[in-house]
Amino acid sequence: MAFTDLLDALGSMGRFQLNHTALLLLPCGLLACHNFLQNFTAAVPPHHCRGPANHTEASTNDSGAWLRATIPLDQLGAPEPCRRFTKPQWALLSPNSSIPGAATEGCKDGWVYNRSVFPSTIVMEWDLVCEARTLRDLAQSVYMAGVLVGAAVFGSLADRLGCKGPLVWSYLQLAASGAATAYFSSFSAYCVFRFLMGMTFSGIILNSVSLVVEWMPTRGRTVAGILLGYSFTLGQLILAGVAYLIRPWRCLQFAISAPFLIFFLYSWWLPESSRWLLLHGKSQLAVQNLQKVAAMNGRKEEGERLTKEVMSSYIQSEFASVCTSNSILDLFRTPAIRKVTCCLMVIWFSNSVAYYGLAMDLQKFGLSLYLVQALFGIINTPAMLVATATMIYVGRRATVASFLILAGLMVIANMFVPEGTQILCTAQAALGKGCLASSFICVYLFTGELYPTEIRQMGMGFASVHARLGGLTAPLVTTLGEYSTILPPVSFGATAILAGLAVCVLTETRNMPLVETIAAMERRVKEGSSKKHVEEKSEEISLQQLRASPLKETI
């Protein structure tokens, strides 16, 4: 008998599972706020050079005649953001006048920012514009680098230390580093603490998903995965609302970091994965956890009858060949695991490139930043409803592949939207982003089901590393737009379609119990191949019999 049978006996979908899932998914929702935070804290307001300090007019008028005389206009008739005249051009104050070839220079005395929407951002505070504009993208890349490092570190630690310890530490690290980011006043310190925050993103997501999935019965894993997606949707909507109410970037940074101190405090009462405890010889603690689960689910008597011997009868066949010392090579050692790993590398990387390419630069759509953020969050709800139905009734593989391919096609189609139609362009991009967000959540669940328990955390961490590489690559792909406007959408769309094709190679896991060991995984694949071969053989024999039967002559 399997461990899932033991969960069924103790109440597989009771009050414990509901409370446990809610407490783990709430922090995941707020992580979405941190992921997209720089859309607001690093927003670039309209700006232009400050006039020369040695002119008395500079202190009296930065918007009228003085502005027209000192700042050239760009092609759209707005003040040039990065250049100013070397000397005031008073002749420009005359109607319909122009001075072609007037000498200009950089913004030696700083910039004047429009603070009507954003009273303060890191761009204003450290002048991350013009020649320094790449530092803004660098800050986001540093955050994504932290997510990348965290995926490798926390994925490996969880296999050795369990899920609970790294999760508790991640909550504390995020609360502390988030507060420090809001406190320190240097750009270098900002980047350091954003890196530490990025690390916790992986630590929280990977361990939360594993704890939710491993305490869920087979029939509840799909719902748990979809709830994770809804928590991300809620987090994006919360970000839009909180950012609208709290405009200064330091206050906003602190406001979305402080709740993780509360998550840190209650996380001490979350139980460790009993699967992991059993695999690492801590059966007594596993029994105690299962007894608490049984009591909370109204199965106290069943829990009291649970002993090490009874538990071993459920799991003996599954854990007999478990080796608790695993390395990254185990992800490539056997054929079945190797195929899963290679496909997931492509899927996670490509999905991430397309997703962050759309979602991390909302100002390019030309609409209200708060409105676009809310729209990009709301669109996830119908996408998740469709994903829920298809994952339950159709399967994981078809759902993920369809969403990825559809998203890729929509991103490429956005190239053909006429200029000046911001609403149509934003709506189409939002639909593509909804498909990518849904596929991302489905892939988290799918990955956890594809890998066996003994290397599940390592596998999810390794796959997540490639997603973070994709997140690092997305800003670089965006810069290709300076050479050709078609390169970014073609790149994002093509990678999404490639990921969808890679999904088709994987095995369907709908309504299948979690595999505990690598050996069991190989046996399942071989048995599946043998069964398919037998079915094909049987079908071939039946067709041969049909051709030879008298019935054929009457058709």
Curated annotation (Swiss-Prot):
Biased composition (Basic and acidic residues): 526-540
Cytoplasmic domain ranges by topology: 1-23, 159-166, 216-225, 272-339, 395-397, 451-485
Residues with glycosylation annotation: N54, N114
Pfam families from the UniProt entry: Sugar_tr
Function field: Organic anion transporter that mediates the uptake of estrone sulfate. Inhibited by probenecid, propionate, 2-methylbutyrate, 3-methylbutyrate, benzoate, heptanoate and 2-ethylhaxanoate. May act as an odorant transporter.
Superkingdom of the organism of origin: Eukaryota
GO molecular function, one term: transmembrane transporter activity
Topological category with respect to the lipid bilayer: Multi-pass membrane protein
Family: Belongs to the major facilitator (TC 2.A.1) superfamily. Organic cation transporter (TC 2.A.1.19) family.
Descriptive protein name: Solute carrier family 22 member 20
GO biological process: monoatomic ion transport; organic anion transport
Chief localization: membrane
Segments on the Extracellular side according to the record's topology features: 45-137, 188-194, 247-250, 361-373, 419-429, 507-555
Gene Ontology CC entries for this record: membrane
Location within or outside the cell: Membrane
Acetylation recorded as keyword: no
Bilayer-crossing regions: 24-44, 138-158, 167-187, 195-215, 226-246, 251-271, 340-360, 374-394, 398-418, 430-450, 486-506
Organism this protein belongs to: Homo sapiens (Human)
